[in-house]
Amino acid sequence: MNNNKPLVAIIMATYNGADFIEEQIESILKQNNVNVHFYISDDDSTDGTLNIVKNFRQKYPENFKGLFNVLIKNPCKNFLNLVNKIDDSYDYYAFSDQDDIWFPDKLEHAIGIINQGHDLYCGRTEIVNSKLISFGYSPLFSFPPSFQNAIVQSIAGGNTMVFNKKIFTLLKNNSQVEVQSHDWWTYILATFTGHKVYYDQNPKVLYRQHNHNYNGSNIGFFNQIIRIFYALIGRYKSWTDKHFVELSKIVDLGTKQSLKTFYQYGILRNRLYLFKFSLNDIYRVGIYRQTTQGNLFLKLAIFLRRA
C-alpha cells in the first residue's frame, strides 16, 4: 500500500448482491491514486454475497477492514449503522452500492473537487442495464446545491457521494435517526449546517438497473408517473415529516439561513387551511427543486398539503 496516497473508507451496505458485487468491488480496487479500505455490512444475504466478499478479503486483507453480518432489512439503516462502526481516521469517505461500476478516476476526481474547498461531492450517473449497455443518464441539474433544495429534493445517489472527515463526523453523530434514505439525509445534513456541496454534471458511475434494485432511476415516463402517484398519496410528505422531526433535534447546528428556511417551510406545509396559500409564499421561503416540472409538482404538493 502506498502511504503517500489518500486513504478512503468505502462504506458498502449489501443484500443479495452476488450477481454484480464482484464487478463493483473490482472497480473500486482499481481506483487511480488512492488507497481504499472496505467496510461492508451485509443484511442477512442468502445468495452467496458474503462468500464473495470473504474471498476478496482473503485475497486483499489489507483492503478489507470490516465485514459485518446484520439483520436489519432496511438499506438506509444498514448504511447508517455501518457509519457508526467506522472511525474518523480516514482522509475521505465514500458510500458504495453493490451493483455499479465506478470509473477508474472517480475517487481521484472527487477528492480533487473536495480539495478545492468543498465538503461533499456527488453527481450524475450513467444508467446501464444488467449487461452494462447504456440507455441514458440521471437527470441533469443546474441549480446550486443548498438547504433550500435539499429540504424538498435529493439530487444524487449515495453511490456518487464522497466526503471529507467533517461530513463523516456530522453524519456519524446524527446516524441514529428515522429517515428514508442515507444519501438524502447526508445532503440535508451537509447543507443545513453550512457545508459546501458540489454536484458534478459529468458521470463517474455506471448505475446498473436490474430487477433487484432497491431504488430505480428517475428517468422514463413510467417512473415519473410513479413519483407523481407517491406525491399524491402523501409518501413524500411522510418522508419530509421525518426530516423535520430529526432536524428539530439539532437546530443548534443550523445556519441562520437554514433555520429561516426550516421554520418558514414548516409553517407553509402545516398551514391549517388548504386554500391559505400563494405562490409568493414559496418565493419568500426560497425552496426549489432542480427542474421546471419538479417545481410545478412542488407547488401542487404544497397546495394539496402533500409536501
Predicted segments, located by residue:
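C-terminal subregions of glycosyltransferases and related glycan-biosynthesis enzymes
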Residues: V179, W185, R208-A307
